[in-house]
Every structure is written in structure tokens, then in C-alpha cells.
């Protein structure tokens, strides 16, 4: 198995290095990751400037000022030859649950892999300690995929509780929960008296009930949420069409 491995928090982050070491026990792994933390980059792609890369002695590649999406795009289309069989993103330091997936660079890297036609996993640890647990879970899933491919055409968003492996209760297939809207902005002043603004923390849990990714992780399970790129709200199409007809939009300007 040939794996393109990326992340959002940089080529030297403990999560990606722990996972790369574990994956190399049974797979051909090419790391292509940002040279620095690009948290919250989501699906941004660098289009107005060129990108430089640096290759380390062990073969890992850092993309200077690159986003996670840049890294996967370059990895698939230029830097990994032959091309990968699968794209893996992580291990993220902190969870990507509920609405987090909208902003997540970790999920975005996996999404770019899927957009380019490859199976893709996004892996996050709900903490900063037991990266080995998340790595073991990921390796188990990838070994299973080697034996029997999963042909859903979906991204698997994997969240692992920050526990020793023997304390993980199992795996649950989940849906995304939701958070309350974030509303905190933290103002500060620079030495010249100018006001600076920091984006505050995410909103608290809103829908974290049974079946959600929040609930699974809180209860000590691995959460696997299938995600897809198509954002169409199919169930709303007829509602919108009927509304347009009723108000006359499209027939009178």
C-alpha cells in the first residue's frame, strides 16, 4: 500500500511523525506536509503565488507556507511517484467533531485526496498525549482496507479519545453533531495602541446526543463519520423550487 500522509500542524508535529513511523511498518509512506502550523486553513489553495518545497534526509517533504490542501494536491500530482493508493491526514492534535469539520485543515487534506479520486482518512486525537493509540487504530483500519476495500466514495473522519489503547471500548459509526455558534472575539492592543483581534474558541456542544461523534468519543469509543464532498441539500431542492414558484422569482424581475 502506498500512502500519502499530510496534516495541518506541520511536518515535525508529533502526530504525523508517530503515524508515519507506525505506517512504515507495513506501507510505503510519503509525508508531504506544511512547514508550519496552518490551523483553520480549511480547503484553501494557494493560487496567487508559487510554492517551494524542502526534502529532509528521511524523505519527508515540507511545503513552505503551504496549506494542507496544497500539500495533498502537490503530493498527488507531482511529488509522490508512483501515485498513492490512499491519502491519510493526521494525527491532528485535538478533535475534529461536529462543525469542526468545516474549518479543519486535517479534514480538508483528506477531502482534497477524495476530490482527486483517492480513498481518504482524516485522523484526530481528542488530546495531546496518546498519539500511539490513534496510530494503532489507523493502522488497523488501513490493514483492513488492504484486505477488503471500502467502496463508499466517502471520507472517513476518525476521532480517537486520548486514552491508552487498552482503554478504548471499540468503534462506533457516527454522524456529525453540532456546536452552538462561536461568538467570542478577544481584543488586545499592540505597543502602538492599535487594536488587534483574536478569534475565540469554538462554540460549546449543541447536538451531542446518541449517534453523534461527540457522544462516541465522550464515552471512550473511536468515532468514524463518513463524510462526502457533495454539499447539495437534496431534501431541500423541492422546497426551494416550490418557494420560488410561489413568490414569482424567476418569472418577474
From Swiss-Prot:
Note the InterPro entries from the entry.
SurE, SurE-like_Pase/nucleotidase, SurE-like_sf
Species of the source? Shigella flexneri
Q: SUPFAM superfamilies, from UniProt?
A: SurE-like (SSF64167)
- Which Gene Ontology cellular component annotation is one that this UniProt entry carries? cytoplasm
State whether keyword Metal-binding applies: yes
What protein family is recorded? Belongs to the SurE nucleotidase family.
- This protein's UniProt keywords: Cytoplasm, Hydrolase, Metal-binding, Nucleotide-binding
Q: List the protein's name.
A: 5'/3'-nucleotidase SurE
What GO MF annotations does this protein's record show? 3'-nucleotidase activity; 5'-nucleotidase activity; exopolyphosphatase activity; metal ion binding; nucleotide binding
Q: Which Gene3D superfamilies match?
A: Survival protein SurE-like phosphatase/nucleotidase
Q: Name the residues that bind a divalent metal cation.
A: 9, 39, 92
Q: Which cofactor does it need?
A: a divalent metal cation
What note does UniProt attach to the cofactor annotation? Answer: Binds 1 divalent metal cation per subunit.
Q: Per its UniProt entry, which superkingdom is the organism in? A: Bacteria
User: Cross-referenced Pfam families, in alphabetical order?
Assistant: SurE
Chief subcellular site?
cytoplasm
> Per the record, what are the reactions this protein catalyses?
a ribonucleoside 5'-phosphate + H2O = a ribonucleoside + phosphate; a ribonucleoside 3'-phosphate + H2O = a ribonucleoside + phosphate; [phosphate](n) + H2O = [phosphate](n-1) + phosphate + H(+)
What is this enzyme's EC?
Answer: 3.1.3.5, 3.1.3.6, 3.6.1.11
This protein's gene is called surE
Q: Which residues are connected by disulfide bridges in this protein?
A: none
Amino acid at each position: 500500500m502506498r500512502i500519502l500522509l499530510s496534516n495541518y500542524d506541520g511536518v515535525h508535529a508529533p502526530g504525523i511523525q508517530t503515524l508515519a513511523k507506525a505506517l512504515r511498518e507495513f506501507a510505503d509512506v510519503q509525508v508531504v506536509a506544511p512547514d508550519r502550523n496552518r490551523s483553520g486553513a480549511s480547503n484553501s489553495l494557494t493560487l496567487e503565488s508559487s510554492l517551494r518545497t524542502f526534502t529532509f534526509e528521511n524523505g519527508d517533504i515540507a511545503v513552505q507556507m503551504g496549506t494542507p490542501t496544497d500539500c495533498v494536491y502537490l503530493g498527488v500530482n507531482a511529488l509522490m511517484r508512483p501515485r498513492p493508493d490512499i491519502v491519510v491526514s493526521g494525527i491532528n492534535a485535538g478533535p475534529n467533531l461536529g462543525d469542526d469539520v468545516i474549518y479543519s485543515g486535517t479534514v480538508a487534506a483528506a477531502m482534497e485526496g477524495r476530490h482527486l479520486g483517492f480513498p481518504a482518512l482524516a485522523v484526530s486525537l481528542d488530546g495531546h498525549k496518546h498519539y500511539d493509540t490513534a496510530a494503532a487504530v489507523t493502522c488497523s483500519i488501513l490493514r483492513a482496507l488492504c484486505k477488503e476495500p471500502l467502496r463508499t466514495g466517502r471520507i472517513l473522519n476518525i476521532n480517537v479519545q486520548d486514552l491508552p489503547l487498552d482503554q478504548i471500548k471499540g468503534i462506533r459509526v457516527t454522524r456529525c453533531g453540532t456546536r452552538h455558534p462561536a461568538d467570542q472575539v478577544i481584543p488586545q492592543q499592540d505597543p502602538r495602541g492599535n487594536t488587534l483581534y483574536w478569534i475565540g474558541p469554538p462554540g460549546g456542544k449543541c447536538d451531542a446526543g446518541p449517534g453523534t461523534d461527540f457522544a462516541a468519543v465522550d464515552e471512550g469509543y473511536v468515532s468514524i463519520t463518513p463524510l462526502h464532498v457533495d454539499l447539495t441539500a437534496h431534501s431541500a431542492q423541492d422546497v426551494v423550487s416550490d418557494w420560488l414558484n410561489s413568490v414569482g422569482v424567476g418569472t418577474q424581475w
